[in-house]
Amino acid sequence: MSYSKIPAGKDLPNDIYVAIEIPANHAPIKYEIDKDTDCLFVDRFMATPMFYPANYGFIPNTLADDGDPLDVLVVTPYPVTPGSVIRARPVGILHMTDDGGGDAKVIAVPHDKLSQLYVDVKEYTDLPALLLEQIKHFFENYKDLEKGKWVKIEGWGNADAARAEIMKSVEAFKG
């Protein structure tokens, strides 16, 4: 399978495809899909023993501020297998900067055709407050024990802000 052949979404920016690299609640291992080989590589064993609070991946054929595809956290009732592509709906964005520059994370839920569990979630604020705190806490701290690495959380944005970031990254990819 070639992730480069997968479009960014079915109905951008409301209906996106996300290639999952790290499942929710998984061991503290950072996986990355290599953009040249489409293979799932172990990027590193995380020094901080924390797990991703939601499935983590990227939107194919996008280019974010950090030079990588746009990152997405997909909240699901079960962990999604790495390498899978899930159809999702953006509900918010976590703006942050790290040692590599701007590194925003789109927050999404499964498309309504995949699950009715999130049909009433239109904005990130419709998700449980504890989950939002867990996401923020994870990204504030997951690099704490890695020398020279840091993260600064700049705040949350709504679904419109997430959709704007998606379109910006799609246009940046097109060049």
Curated annotation (Swiss-Prot):
Q: Write one Gene Ontology MF term.
A: magnesium ion binding
Q: Which Gene3D superfamilies match?
A: Inorganic pyrophosphatase
Q: Which residues form a coiled coil?
A: none
Q: Which UniProt keywords apply?
A: Cytoplasm, Hydrolase, Magnesium, Metal-binding
Which cofactors are named for this entry? Mg(2+)
Q: Which InterPro entries match?
A: Pyrophosphatase, Pyrophosphatase_sf
Q: Which residues bind Mg(2+) 1?
A: 66, 71, 103
Localization terms from the record = Cytoplasm
Q: Which reaction does it catalyse?
A: diphosphate + H2O = 2 phosphate + H(+)
Per UniProt, where does substrate bind?
Answer: 30, 44, 56, 142
Where does this protein chiefly localize?
Answer: cytoplasm
**Gene Ontology CC annotations of this record:** cytoplasm
UniProt-listed Enzyme Commission number(s): 3.6.1.1
Sequence positions that bind Mg(2+) 2: 71
Q: One matching Pfam family, short form?
A: Pyrophosphatase
The Gene Ontology biological process annotation of the record reads: phosphate-containing compound metabolic process
EC class of this enzyme? hydrolase
| Entry annotated with the keyword Hydrolase | yes
The annotated subunit structure for this chain is: Homohexamer.
Under the heading HAMAP family, the entry gives: Inorganic_PPase
- State the family named in the UniProt similarity comment for this chain: Belongs to the PPase family.
Function, please?
Answer: Catalyzes the hydrolysis of inorganic pyrophosphate (PPi) forming two phosphate ions.
**Stated name of the protein:** Inorganic pyrophosphatase 1
Q: Which organism is it from?
A: Pseudomonas syringae pv. tomato (strain ATCC BAA-871 / DC3000)
The major lineage groups are: Bacteria, Pseudomonadati, Pseudomonadota, Gammaproteobacteria, Pseudomonadales
Give the gene name: ppa1
